[in-house]
Regions:
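ATP-dependent carboxylate/acyl-activation modules
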Residues: 1-103, 107-197
Length: 197
């Protein structure tokens, strides 16, 4: 149960900003089905999940925040508050170098306030050099041990689900190698860039 010291009638939404690695773009994923496991919603009622892809050349635009508020069925003051919330959420996502920023549930109260009740944030390890204060919050027990070991050795390593290992010199070569593996019917087991070491 969540305590909210205001009007008790609420509508719950789901919203997250994350990096779509296949598209190479940030995307806002949102749904009217907040307060529940979004994977369950995706499996049983995928039509209730919306995606708004953000063009990195121009960033989040006003028409996109309005589209999100409209798709959530909001109007009046709640519509305005949601557009402001979406813009602020995206600004925070970029500002802290996150790779995922999830709000679930996101409340709309009967007095048209938008309230983030719970949040999960995943920081992009490649942006940590801009935020030295984040290191104190890092919990390496929550990370893949192989990735932690590679990081401590100064290597850029990402574990994947495939069966073919990739060790390359440079991110561009890594991406091309992974594409060739996929085209040949395999799946990359990792991304290991040893460039500069």
């Amino acid at each position: 149960d969540v305590y909210y010291p205001g009007p008790t009638e609420v509508k719950e939404f789901y919203m997250s900003v994350l990096l779509d690695r296949e598209k190479g773009r940030n995307v806002i994923v949102y749904s009217t089905e907040g307060g529940m496991d979004i994977e369950h919603v995706a499996e049983h009622t995928p039509e209730k999940i919306h995606r708004e892809v953000i063009d990195p050349r121009v960033g989040l635009q006003g028409f996109q925040t309005r589209k999100i508020a409209f798709n959530l069925g909001l109007s009046g003051e709640a519509f305005k508050q949601m557009t402001k919330f979406v813009a602020s959420l995206y600004k925070a996502y970029e500002g802290i170098d996150a790779s995922m920023f999830e709000i679930n549930p996101l409340f709309k109260t009967s007095d048209d306030k938008i309230i983030a009740v719970d949040a999960k944030v995943t920081l992009d390890g490649n942006g940590l050099f801009r935020h030295p204060d984040y290191e104190a919050m890092r919990d390496k027990t929550e990370e893949d041990p192989t990735e932690v070991e590679a990081d401590e050795a100064g290597l850029n390593f990402v574990k994947l689900d495939g069966n073919v290992g990739c060790m390359v010199n440079g991110a561009g070569l890594a991406m091309a190698t992974m594409d060739i593996i996929k085209l040949s019917g395999g799946n990359p087991a990792n991304f290991l860039d040893v460039g500069g070491t």
